[in-house]
C-alpha cells in the first residue's frame, strides 16, 4: 500500500517540478528592450526593439491599443528573428499604446515597458516638411521624368537624322541626274537649230 502511495507521490513531485521548471524558464526570458516607434505616418508606423543576448527567442507578440479604449489588436509571429514590425490601419491624430513580448519554446516573456505615441495629421506632416527636403519617392519620380524626357529627345533626334539622311539621298540623286538633263537639253537645242541645205549652203527665202 505504501509502495503505491509512494510511487504516486514521486510522480506528483516530478510533475510539479516540471511545471515549476517550465515557469522558471518562461520567467527567465527577458522583456524586450529599447522599444521605439519609427517611420511614423498618419496611418502607419514601425515598432522596433532589442533583446538580451542569449535569450532563446523564436518570435514576438505585440499588443496595440488606442489610449482610453479597451479594444486591442494582437500581432504574433513565430519562427523569426526579426526585431521590427509594421503597424497599419492606424487613425490620424490618435494616441496608441504598444507592448512587445518575446516568445520562446517555453512561453512568452513579460511585456515590455509601454510605449505611447500619437499619429500625426496629414496636414501636420506636410507643414513640417521643409521645402528643401526630398524624399526617396520624389527622387524616384524625378528620375522617371528625366528618363522619359531623354527617351523623347532620343526619338526626336533619330527622326531628324532620318529626315536629313533622306534629304541628302534625294539631293545626291537629283545632282547625279543634272548632267544627263544638260546633255538632253543640248541635244534638243541642236536638233531645233536652222537646217542646212543638202549642197552645203543655207536655205534662204525667196524675195
Curated annotation (Swiss-Prot):
Q: Which residues are glycosylated?
A: 34, 79
Give the InterPro entries listed for this entry: FN3_dom, FN3_sf, FNDC5_C, FNDC_type_III_4/5, Ig-like_fold
Q: Name one GO cellular component term.
A: peroxisomal membrane
| Keywords recorded for this protein, A-Z | Cell membrane, Glycoprotein, Hormone, Membrane, Peroxisome, Secreted, Signal, Transmembrane, Transmembrane helix
Q: Listed GO molecular functions?
A: hormone activity
Signal peptide range in chain numbering: 1-26
Topological domain spans for side Extracellular: 27-146
- Pfam families attached to this UniProt entry: DUF4808 (PF16066), fn3 (PF00041)
Q: Report whether NAD shows up as a keyword of the record.
A: no
Q: Which residues cross the membrane?
A: 147-167
UniProt PTM comment: The extracellular domain is cleaved and released from the cell membrane.
Marked site positions, Required for dimerization: 73
Basic and acidic residues bias locations: 178-188
Tagged with keyword Transmembrane helix: yes
Q: Report membrane topology.
A: Single-pass type I membrane protein
Q: Which SUPFAM superfamilies match?
A: Fibronectin type III (SSF49265)
The UniProt record lists the Fibronectin type-III domain at 31-122
Where are the Cytoplasmic topological domains? 168-207
Residue ranges annotated as motif Microbody targeting signal: 205-207
Q: Tell me the segments the record calls region Disordered.
A: 178-207
Where is it located? Cell membrane; Peroxisome membrane
Q: What is known of its domains?
A: Fibronectin type-III domain is capable of forming a continuous intersubunit beta-sheet dimer; dimerization may thereby play a role in cell-cell adhesion or signaling.
Q: Which PANTHER family match?
A: FIBRONECTIN TYPE III DOMAIN-CONTAINING PROTEIN (PTHR14470), FIBRONECTIN TYPE III DOMAIN-CONTAINING PROTEIN 5 (PTHR14470:SF1)
- What name is this protein filed under? Fibronectin type III domain-containing protein 5b
